[in-house]
Amino acid sequence: MSDNRIYTDRDCVETGCGCSLKGKVVVLKESNLEAGFGRQLYYCTGGNGANANALGKSVFLVNLKNGEFERCVRDHVLGVLKPELMPDEEKLQLSQIRPPGALPLENHEPQYSGYSFLEDGRYAAGVWLCNEKEAMEYVEMQKPYQHRIMLCDRNDFCVWEVRDGMQIYPPQEKLDEMSEGLVKNPGPMQL
């Protein structure tokens, strides 16, 4: 269904060189479809052209149809997609992307797995996350687009859950207790 849709500036929450692209789903201009880019929707992982009012031009992307890494110039980007317009298949592909700067799995043992669910319950396989920082970055990058996000520990127990952008587990009281404990006994936090 999303294959035939042509996205325009009306489908973007931000457009132009003044918006930051990193960590967001971006729309490539329709003219780029003929220039070798077969899709309009990509996840931006960075590049010297990804910042607002960037001096550079390179933008690094992940294709939300096939998961392949690609590069374009900033001028090819129309803007940042409105989250509510993201098609389900692209949401599933986005759920498989580890946060930019994630540690390589070859020499780091994952501590968590991240899952993102569509409203109908569909999801793709979990994503390995090596530490708390990566786990929280995964939640933040998925939150605008996904219905439900769940982080599980190595034993596959849920340690964090967000639904429709709102944290539901652990409850706020538990987080308050944890933060009070950190003030009294500083040290690593366990999710």
Residues covered by each model-derived region:
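Short aromatic-glycine-(Arg/Gly/Cys) micro-motifs in beta-strand/loop hairpins
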Residues: 101-124
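Non-Sec secretion/translocation targeting segments of pathogen effectors
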Residues: 180-191
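Mixed-charge, Lys/Arg-rich low-complexity intrinsically disordered regions
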Residues: 1-24, 29, 97-99
